């Protein structure tokens, strides 16, 4: 019989002042069932897989039983949602059980999402349908496999209870793992209340836990702002490189550690267009694909505003220091973005004209409605000695439209003289063959919601956790959607 799961909890956030959170227990559910346990992640966290698969483990994932050492809390935060200020949000359907120190010595949050009402529920039921649980599990693990900093999914369970949204749906709970759940909105919460002591405590906490190298800096809070700016710029550049659209880049979904946080109405590009926006609630396309760098800077500006009292006692000097830090965002983003563009094109060296060459390709893709992921993957398979019939041409409605650009690209590749096998391998390592296409996510959600069938979820996880591998047996899952499979809108659904 499996032993009781042992969680090595050490809950630093729960030791902060009480105004940072509300103490609340998860609400038990009627008949939990284990959908998926992320065994590699469990092992990395130092947890015993066999014990987690037992009845006691299931009860913990369902919120029916607290593991020893847990101190469940719902975090307080505020935020700008679609540019509009909301002074109190907080964890309305999630409970942070505590923190564990993993096998690499890193502190990780363990959160139950969909675990019942909290003081921040604002009239909601605190629950989650199984569909969004499946979506987030798939998305977070796919993003991790792509090499993008992200929260992770440790487990998904059904609750045996219905959840009423636009229709009645089966309930679910996700166990989310994160390096941090501190957001820009956490700082905004105390800034709006003019609680400078709390802001200082929070900033010092973030430095001590996530940026310890800044502790001895002469201006640690300014250094913190700059570090968050750098990590956020790097994160968004990484999103752009794989065609990811977050969909709801509110300040309460902007992590202080450069981690992708919250998978609501997200999506991945199919046909390339820079203004693509799938989110049904984003009626002004505020968070469209090409707007994500601008919005990241806007969110970081809100963070900088909250830190002004900590940057200097003179407001003008504080504003000047914050402004200088914010001016570093665009250069950092462009450096990361351009480096990733070069890598996607197989260019190992930086030369004048490289970015123009990349933009020419993107413009051509937009005009031809070519698939973002397929084009770059096909370029990885191109051979310079193939005069005209390379695989990338087949990605375009008018194959000959690519020929002029392809000739210039091959000429640029020849300037480096890199062996072709090395160039192809390098490109395949950054241009995924498999992404969580919107219609595939919907396939898994529909199967889980309508039939209680988690086979599609399992199949996608097998493939998406190896996104750069050829996997010829999964060729159908690499294909763009057929017209009848197109997903034009995504929803939060929670």
From Swiss-Prot:
Mg(2+) binds at residues 253, 262. GO terms for molecular function: AMPylase activity; ATP binding; magnesium ion binding. Its cofactor is Mg(2+); Mn(2+). Keywords: ATP-binding, Magnesium, Manganese, Metal-binding, Nucleotide-binding, Nucleotidyltransferase, Transferase. ATP binds at residues 90, 92-93, 113, 125-126, 176, 183, 262. Its EC number is 2.7.7.-, 2.7.7.108. The active site is at residue 252. The keyword ATP-binding applies. Transmembrane segments: none annotated. It catalyses: L-seryl-[protein] + ATP = 3-O-(5'-adenylyl)-L-seryl-[protein] + diphosphate; L-threonyl-[protein] + ATP = 3-O-(5'-adenylyl)-L-threonyl-[protein] + diphosphate; L-tyrosyl-[protein] + ATP = O-(5'-adenylyl)-L-tyrosyl-[protein] + diphosphate; L-histidyl-[protein] + UTP = N(tele)-(5'-uridylyl)-L-histidyl-[protein] + diphosphate. Belongs to the SELO family. Nucleotidyltransferase involved in the post-translational modification of proteins. It can catalyze the addition of adenosine monophosphate (AMP) or uridine monophosphate (UMP) to a protein, resulting in modifications known as AMPylation and UMPylation. This is Protein nucleotidyltransferase YdiU. It comes from Alkalilimnicola ehrlichii (strain ATCC BAA-1101 / DSM 17681 / MLHE-1). The gene is ydiU.
């Amino acid at each position: 019989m499996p032993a009781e799961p042992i969680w090595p909890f050490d809950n630093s956030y729960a030791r902060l002042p009480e105004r940072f959170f509300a103490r609340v227990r998860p609400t038990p559910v009627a008949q939990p069932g284990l959908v998926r346990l992320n065994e590699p992640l469990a092992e990395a966290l130092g947890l015993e897989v066999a014990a987690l698969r037992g009845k006691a483990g299931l009860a913990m994932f369902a919120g029916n039983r607290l593991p020893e050492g847990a101190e469940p809390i719902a975090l307080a935060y505020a935020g700008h949602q679609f540019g509009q200020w909301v002074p109190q949000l907080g964890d309305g359907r999630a409970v942070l059980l505590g923190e564990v120190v993993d096998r690499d010595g890193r502190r990780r949050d363990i959160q139950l999402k969909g675990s019942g009402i909290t003081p921040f529920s604002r009239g909601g039921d605190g629950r989650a349908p199984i569909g969004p649980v499946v979506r987030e599990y798939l998305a977070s693990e796919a993003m991790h496999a792509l090499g993008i900093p992200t929260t992770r999914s440790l487990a998904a369970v059904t609750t045996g209870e219905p959840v009423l949204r636009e229709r009645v749906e089966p309930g679910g709970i996700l166990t989310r793992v994160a390096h941090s759940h501190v957001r820009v909105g956490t700082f905004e919460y105390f800034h709006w209340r003019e609680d400078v002591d709390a802001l200082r405590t929070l900033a010092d906490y973030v430095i001590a836990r996530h940026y310890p190298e800044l502790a001895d800096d002469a201006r640690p809070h300014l250094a913190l702002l700059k570090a968050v700016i750098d990590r956020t710029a790097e994160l968004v550049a990484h999103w752009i490189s794989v065609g990811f659209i977050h969909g709801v880049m509110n300040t309460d979904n902007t992590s202080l550690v450069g981690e992708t946080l919250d998978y609501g109405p997200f999506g991945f590009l199919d046909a390339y267009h820079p203004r693509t926006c799938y989110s049904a609630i984003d009626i002004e396309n505020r968070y469209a694909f090409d707007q994500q760098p601008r919005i990241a800077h806007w969110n970081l500006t809100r963070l900088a505003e909250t830190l002004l009292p900590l940057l200097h006692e003179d407001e003008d000097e504080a504003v000047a220091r914050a402004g200088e830090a914010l001016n570093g965002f665009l250069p950092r983003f462009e450096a990361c973005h351009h480096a990733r563009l070069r890598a996607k094109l197989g260019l190992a060296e930086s030369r004048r004209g490289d970015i123009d060459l990349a933009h020419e390709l993107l413009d051509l893709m937009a005009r031809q409605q070519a698939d973002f992921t397929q084009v770059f993957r096909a370029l990885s398979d191109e051979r310079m000695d193939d005069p005209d019939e390379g695989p990338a041409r087949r990605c375009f409605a008018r194959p000959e439209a690519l020929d002029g650009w392809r000739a210039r690209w091959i000429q640029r590749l020849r300037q480096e003289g890199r062996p072709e096998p090395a160039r192809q391998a390098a490109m395949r390592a950054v241009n995924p063959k498999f992404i969580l296409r919107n219609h595939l996510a919907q396939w898994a959600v529909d199967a889980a919601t309508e039939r209680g069938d988690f086979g599609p979820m399992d199949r996608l996880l097998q493939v998406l956790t190896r996104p750069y591998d050829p996997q010829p047996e999964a060729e159908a899952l690499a294909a763009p959607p057929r017209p009848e499979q197109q997903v034009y809108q995504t929803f939060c659904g929670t």
